[in-house]
Swiss-Prot record:
Protein's GO biological process: carbohydrate transport; glycerophosphodiester transmembrane transport
NCBIfam families listed in its UniProt record: PRK11650.1 (NF008653)
Enzyme Commission number, as recorded: 7.6.2.10
Cellular compartments annotated: Cell inner membrane
SUPFAM superfamilies documented for this protein: MOP-like, P-loop containing nucleoside triphosphate hydrolases
Source organism per UniProt: Yersinia enterocolitica serotype O:8 / biotype 1B (strain NCTC 13174 / 8081)
Name assigned to this protein: sn-glycerol-3-phosphate import ATP-binding protein UgpC
Topology within the bilayer: Peripheral membrane protein
């Protein structure tokens, strides 16, 4: 096991435009970190730099306090699991897991001990003589993990390892990854575009956007207190409702573009006349039966459509020409065209500066 440190890591392919911008990260011994973000955000590039498959333009990478920035991948003490398994089709499961050890000069008995132990951990013992074509997708991915485990690396690197699996198998493999990490306690850096994977696997999440680490925090911190508008819009399904507007001169209302006002039970006079974006998650909006427009009874919204999800329902509408989604219980089934009265609890409101995108603190 080892710690991992990234110090002002930057990457540019043309020497002008950075695709990774000054990333600083400290991963403690045995920690499981997940990088999440949309396609093209730089998460896989950053992982490849840690692996040594990409060179940094500037900055340094340390593994267990050893500077590895210019080291070859084989000398860094890392093991990588890829999206496409990368198994040798003509080799058995045993030989696939053992191959890396063979070319590094390990003895037969040491190889057998390591492969047998990894197979036991991953429940692959009955499959050691099979070829990859005889395995399911989940079994192939476990073989790929086994090949990484036998190396006994200082750091595990995972590059979207579950992307090729169907939804049901992804759930199963997430659970297996959690159990594997609890057992091995190896420092791990994991890349995914799937926020469910990020939130369920990570001890800390790095939300990436355009080469920048927008926020680094626990899953709870990232979800409950997003640091930027991007994080608020990316994390959560459905995403946080984000409404652009201005705080009234007395700080007691939030005025939307068309003049519609949302009462603020907790006045914000310090932000008077300032252009902000108000955010609230769909599950925090509460439906009221009263038709009064006071904040305690709810603000009216005409229902455009209702999505029935089984466990709950999503009500879609608009305020001030801006989309709003409220998560209702499965028992609440209003019809399209009806008016809902929605209450916004003060403690559930988030405010962001509309220009910088940064979170506003009261």
């Amino acid at each position: 096991m080892a710690c991992l440190k990234l110090q002002a890591v930057t990457k540019s392919y043309d020497g002008v435009t950075p695709v990774i911008k000054q990333i600083d990260l400290d991963v403690t011994d045995g920690e499981f970190i997940v990088m999440v973000g949309p396609s093209g955000c730089g998460k896989s590039t950053l992982l490849r730099m840690v692996a040594g498959l990409e060179r940094t333009t500037s900055g340094d990478i340390y593994i267990d306090n050893l500077r590895v920035t210019d080291m070859e991948p084989k000398d860094r003490g890392i093991a990588m699991v890829f999206q496409n398994y990368a198994l040798y089709p003509h080799m058995s499961v045993f030989d696939n897991m053992a191959y890396g050890l063979k070319i590094r000069g390990f003895g037969k008995e040491q190889i057998r001990q390591r492969v047998d132990e990894a197979a036991r951990i991953l429940e692959l013992e009955p499959l050691l003589k099979r070829k990859p074509r005889e395995l399911s997708g989940g079994q192939r991915q476990r073989v790929a993990m086994g090949r990484a485990i036998v190396r006994e690396p200082a750091v595990f690197l995972f590059d979207e390892p579950l992307s090729n699996l169907d939804a049901k198998l992804r759930v199963q493999m997430r659970l297996e990854l959690q159990q594997l990490h609890r057992r091995l306690k190896t420092t791990s850096l994991y890349v995914t575009h799937d926020q469910v994977e990020a939130m369920t696997l990570a001890q800390r999440v790095i939300v990436m956007n355009k080469g920048v680490a927008e926020q680094i925090g626990t899953p709870s911190e990232v979800y409950q207190r997003p640091a930027t508008l991007f994080v608020a819009s990316f994390i959560g399904s459905p995403a946080m409702n984000l409404l652009a507007g201005t705080v009234s001169p007395d700080g007691r209302a939030f005025i939307l573009a068309d003049g519609m006002t949302l009462p603020l039970e907790v006045p914000r006079p310090q932000w008077a006349d300032r252009r902000l974006t108000l955010g609230i998650r769909p599950e925090h909006i509460q439906q009221r039966v009263s038709q009064q427009k006071t904040s305690a009874q709810g603000v009216p919204m005409t229902l455009l459509t209702l999505e029935l999800l089984g466990a709950d329902n999503l009500a879609h509408g608009q305020w001030g020409g801006q989309s709003v989604i409220a998560r209702l219980s499965h028992e609440e089934m209003p019809t399209a065209g009806s008016v809902l009265y929605l209450y916004l609890p003060p403690a559930a409101l988030h405010f962001f500066d509309s220009e910088s995108g940064l979170r506003m603190e009261s």
